[in-house]
Design a protein with these regions (language model features):
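HhH-family (HhH-GPD) DNA N-glycosylase catalytic core used in base-excision repair
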Residues: 1-252
């Protein structure tokens, strides 16, 4: 259930409820380690990011309130008619709809998984705001450390993202849209040629409507389609399906 109201300054306040348990430390830790400077800002209890929807830029902040099992969200965006879409993306990002108690109850029946489930109850699968952004990150993350991938994706965002001015410190630009990276010169940024070509191919196919990483394709259709792109292997395709398509059966 969510409630919303317009706050002074044009921000909309939302309250998204979730069913416990929820391992907030694991969720925010995962997102923080992979945060794109200037696009995302993560603390021990909050997550914030810029976004672009239907050509209009905005941002949101999410504050986790474990005692009340709520996520308090402030959205700054000029078109309230798209608020429903924004809420759904935020829910998917934090895997809000997961019934963690039921999932843990099932997994604890496995003798090998049981100790981990008992130690870390309420683990959820982090989603994403943008399937394209995630695909770029996944491609750049091939055969390198998470830290190295974060460095590369931050270079792309800083050079080709649109400047953004909001009221949240650390949010300075939006991640570049596919059309921007179709023509972007990514040489000299430390990215190998095959990955540059893969990013450009994904962007081109999204622009032509041949690929959909926003829920318009199921995993059975999406994985073979994106795997046709040179430089995108099974792990990358399954990872994108797991986080962008919210497929519980995807297995990177």
């Amino acid at each position: 259930m969510n409630r919303n109201k317009l706050k002074e300054g044009g921000n909309i306040e939302l309250s998204l409820s979730y069913r416990p348990p929820f391992d907030l430390e694991a969720m925010l830790g995962f997102l923080a380690y992979r945060a794109i400077p200037g696009v995302e800002a993560v603390t021990a209890h909050s997550y914030a990011r810029t976004f672009r929807l239907e050509g209009l830029a905005g941002h949101f902040q999410a504050f986790f309130e474990p005692r009340s099992h709520n996520i308090r969200v402030y959205v700054s965006y000029g078109e309230t008619r798209h608020l429903g879409r924004i809420i759904e993306r935020i829910r998917a990002l934090f895997d809000v709809r997961a019934d963690s108690a039921q999932i843990d109850e099932f997994l604890v029946q496995d003798s090998q998984l049981a100790p981990m489930v008992r130690r870390f109850p309420g683990l959820r699968v982090p989603g994403c705001w943008s399937g394209f952004e995630l695909a770029v990150r996944a491609i750049l993350g091939q055969q390198v450390t998470v830290k190295a991938a974060s460095t590369l994706v931050s270079r792309v965002a800083e050079r080709y993202g649109e400047a953004y001015e909001g009221d949240v410190e650390g949010l300075n630009y939006t991640f570049p849209e596919p059309a921007r990276l179709v023509v972007a010169d990514l040489d000299g940024m430390g990215i190998v040629g095959v990955r540059i070509a893969a990013i450009r191919a994904v962007a081109e196919q999204l622009e032509r409507g041949e690929l959909d990483i926003g829920g318009g394709m199921d995993t059975e259709t999406f994985v073979p389609a994106i795997r046709k792109i040179k430089g995108v292997g099974e792990w990358t395709a399954q990872y994108i399906a797991m986080r962008a398509l919210s497929d519980p059966n995807a297995f990177p």
